[in-house]
Amino acid sequence: MPVVREFLPNDSAQVNVLALVAFEQFKDSYHDWPTFRAKIGNMSALADVGEIIVAEVEGQIVGAVAYVGPGVPKAEFFRPEWPIMRMLVVAPDFRGRGIGRALAQECIHRAKRDGASVFALHTSELMHVALPMYQRMGFKLKSAAPMIHGVKYDVYAKEIDG
């Protein structure tokens, strides 16, 4: 079972490489992959606006996600009072072991901690493993989000009990 813990500054390199490895399978789907790749490869910068949470197995970071709380600046297609989850990534060799779900659940726990009644994310049908997981967890389609480098994204939200 993975250890879910807070991101530490010395985790930056591992988290950035993990994000690149996790998104590599989609490189042919995004227009201007080099620009998008540069953004993905700087996932650790999300620590400046949110809380990065990592999943670790035997000292190796195998999953990560960023939680951005209510009232913190975020993309205009999210309501300001909604906490959100950004860039849930899991190493390909560790998928199917509940790591993504554990990280998402930790974000939901933090949203409850922060007194939120709704928790949101944006994702794409391209994410053929993540999207069904979110739907099984109770996330519902709310609205379209702007395309990202030619890929359609949508906003999903889940009502949560404090």
List the model feature ranges, each with a label:
Residues 90, 96-109, 132-136:
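Conserved acetyl-CoA-binding loop-helix of GNAT-fold acetyltransferases
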Residues 104, 111-123:
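Conserved GNAT acetyl-CoA-binding A-motif
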Residues 3-17:
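A short beta-loop-alpha structural element at the N-terminal edge
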Residues 121-130, 147-152:
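Conserved beta-strand-loop-alpha-helix junction that forms the acyl-donor binding cleft
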Residues 43-54, 84:
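A short helix-loop-beta-strand connector motif used in the catalytic cores of GNAT acetyltransferases and
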Residues 16, 20-45:
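Conserved GNAT-fold acetyl-CoA-binding loop/helix
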Residues 54, 60-69, 84, 89:
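Conserved beta-strand in the GNAT
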Residues 76-92:
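Conserved acetyl-CoA binding element of GNAT-fold acetyltransferases
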